[in-house]
Curated annotation (Swiss-Prot):
UniProt GO molecular function: structural constituent of ribosome
Superkingdom in the source lineage: Bacteria
Gene Ontology, cellular component aspect: ribonucleoprotein complex; ribosome
Bias-annotated ranges (Basic residues): 53-62
The protein's name in its UniProt record: Small ribosomal subunit protein bS21
Biased composition (Basic and acidic residues): 40-52
Database matches in Pfam families: Ribosomal_S21 (PF01165)
Matching HAMAP family: Ribosomal_bS21
PROSITE patterns found in the cross-reference section: RIBOSOMAL_S21
PANTHER family linked to this entry: MITOCHONDRIAL 28S RIBOSOMAL PROTEIN S21, SMALL RIBOSOMAL SUBUNIT PROTEIN BS21
Similarity-based family: Belongs to the bacterial ribosomal protein bS21 family.
InterPro entries: Ribosomal_bS21, Ribosomal_bS21_CS, Ribosomal_bS21_sf
Length: 62
């Protein structure tokens, strides 16, 4: 859970920008999107192996 306290003489836009930055650094939004819908374990395994294959091919190119 990210907390952002609005500082004295700080605009709301600046505070919102700081909040968005902390959320992106923590990976909160990415985690939320990953868990938004249920994935069957078989689908998780399939996606994991596809990602590994892509990484392997990418490393092989260079």
């Amino acid at each position: 859970m990210s907390k952002t306290i609005v500082r004295k003489n700080e605009s709301l836009d600046d505070a919102l920008r700081r909040f968005k930055r902390t959320v992106s650094r923590n990976g909160t939004l990415q985690e939320y999107r990953k868990r938004e819908f249920y994935e069957k374990p078989s689908v998780k395994r399939k996606l994991k192996s596809e990602a590994a294959r892509k990484r392997k091919n990418k490393r092989r190119r260079y």
